[in-house]
């Protein structure tokens, strides 16, 4: 099994505040006296996007997760629930949010480094746990397997398919996100039982790749 996630670079050369329009003007309906700024969401369009994602899953057999780091408006989780396989979290509290708001859905979590004082609680929420390094896998993997969790390792394939985004390319040289082949080979030589802990691999790519 392979897990993949995407990160989208900022498309705008000159970022503007989210509550202004393309010309930098404040929407009149939001900037009057005593009117708080707020997000406006079109539920019909949100559902349409969900239908598109559901169609992709049905045609390909893949699973699409809600990346809570990018969108954690839990009031709308019930709207998205029919279209998505579950949630993706970057730590304990996002994983808990996904479990509380979408209890019947899959709960995936990846963190660059898990905390020992939080990991036992995390096991109450997460179904799939991805580790960033062989060290983290060796430290926490046995407990995750004993709890019946699906265990993965984030890998760095050390291969980029585009230029211009090196500063946040997780596959760039020197990236500390994911395990390189050399790092894995060295760790597996010292700990031959590491491969037995794994159910799959996770790789992260930019959305243009």
Language model: regions and residue ranges:
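An N-terminal domain-start capping segment
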Residues: 1, 57-59
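Alpha-helical packing segments of well-folded alpha/beta enzyme cores
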Residues: 46-49, 53, 187
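Short, flexible, solvent-exposed loop/turn segments with mixed acidic/basic and small polar residues
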Residues: 27, 54-56, 116-120
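A short alpha-helix capping/helix-coil boundary motif
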Residues: 30-34, 54-57, 72-76, 166-167
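N-terminal glycine-rich anion-binding loops that anchor highly charged ligand groups
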Residues: 22-25, 52, 58, 64-65, ...
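Alpha/beta catalytic barrel-like cores
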Residues: 1-34, 38-43, 47-49
């Amino acid at each position: 099994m392979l897990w993949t996630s995407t990160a989208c670079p900022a498309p705008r050369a000159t970022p503007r505040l989210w509550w202004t329009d393309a010309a930098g003007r404040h929407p009149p309906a939001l900037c009057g006296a005593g009117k708080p700024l707020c997000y406006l969401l079109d539920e019909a369009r949100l559902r349409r996007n969900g239908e598109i994602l559901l169609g992709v899953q049905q045609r390909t057999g893949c699973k699409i997760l809600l990346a809570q780091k990018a969108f954690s408006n839990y009031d709308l989780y019930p709207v998205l629930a029919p279209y998505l396989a579950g949630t993706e979290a970057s730590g304990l509290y996002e994983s808990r949010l996904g479990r509380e708001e979408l209890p019947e859905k899959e709960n995936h979590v990846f963190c660059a480094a898990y905390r020992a004082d939080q990991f036992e609680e995390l096991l109450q929420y997460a179904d799939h746990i991805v580790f960033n390094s062989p060290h983290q896998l060796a430290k926490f993997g046995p407990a995750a397997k004993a709890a019946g969790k699906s265990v993965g390792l984030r890998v760095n394939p050390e291969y980029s398919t585009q230029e211009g985004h090196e500063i946040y390319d997780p596959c760039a040289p020197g990236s500390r996100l994911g395990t390189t082949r050399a790092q894995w080979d060295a760790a597996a030589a010292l700990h031959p039982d590491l491969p037995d802990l794994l159910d799959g691999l996770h790789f992260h790519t930019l959305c243009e790749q």
